[in-house]
Amino acid sequence: MEEKVEKVKKIAVVGAGPAGLAFSFAAAKRGHQVTLYESEKSIGGQFNMAKKVPGKEEFEETLRYYGEMMKKWGVQLKLGTRVETNDLLLGEYDEVILATGVNPRVPKIKGIGHPKVLLYTDVLKKGAEVGKRVAVIGAGGIGFDVSEFLLQDPSKVSTGLDKTEYFKKWGVDTSQARPGGLVEKIEEEEPFRSIYLCQRKASKLGIGLGKTTGWAHRLSLKKDGVHMLAGVEYKEINDQGLVIIHNGEEKTLEVDHVIICSGQTPKRNLFPELEEAGVKVHLVGGAHEAKELDAKGAIKEATLLALKI
């Protein structure tokens, strides 16, 4: 149970993603005066990309919840507002929380500036058009999510709540007329896109995914015909596609687009200037540590910080 604070502080939070929302909620609930700045016109940050991935539609409800909590606990929400160091200094805040998230990491590959190349943010956030043949560089959580997203036909987007669609895909016999509750033959559909999911490491793809769900994600992608390539050396991106060395052989993956999902770097450009100005400043979420996008970890870290301030 959160204890009310003895001394109310004036706190600025920059970034309304999972970490910024969690901190603002917990700090305001304890009695602090919180102003939350967000450069976009809506709250959510990375959640706004995650909720577009099949099976993660429930994040929309998470955002609705946080939106209500901001109102309930009096968080002053400033959307569409990009703040600079001077803005925060003029605000005379007791403490500043930077929950500014991450930037996609761009690998050093010959031809990385080719028009075929898209970042995962171009696909999930900006709605870039993607061709039918795709290579995904990076097979962590983001690479898997982007692959799942690209496999869905936009004209048949599921809400994630349609059991009939799930049963059909996996051959579940809802009539219970057959032994084991499975149909004799699953009607396989042609995948919406042809996808190569690639990683540099020679280990199994998706090894860092959840222990209880990683196998399911791998199975789902394999069922949809995704080609999973480990131990890949990237040589070049050109008009023909992505040139790689795999199993000692050089080959060209003839694709329309190459999607970069090779990690992130912290977005913390405000930190040095604020620290130099003597402001008590904290980094949370991806701005603190840019590992695989981890909303649960970011929310926990931000909440624990709010309980200490």
Q: What do these predicted ranges mean?
A:
Residues 3-37, 43, 78-88, 92, ...:
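Rossmann-like dinucleotide/flavin-binding elements
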Residues 238-242:
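Short, hydrophobic/aromatic-rich segments at coil-to-beta transitions
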Residues 43-93, 206-232:
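N-terminal Rossmann-like dinucleotide/flavin-binding domain of flavoprotein oxidoreductases
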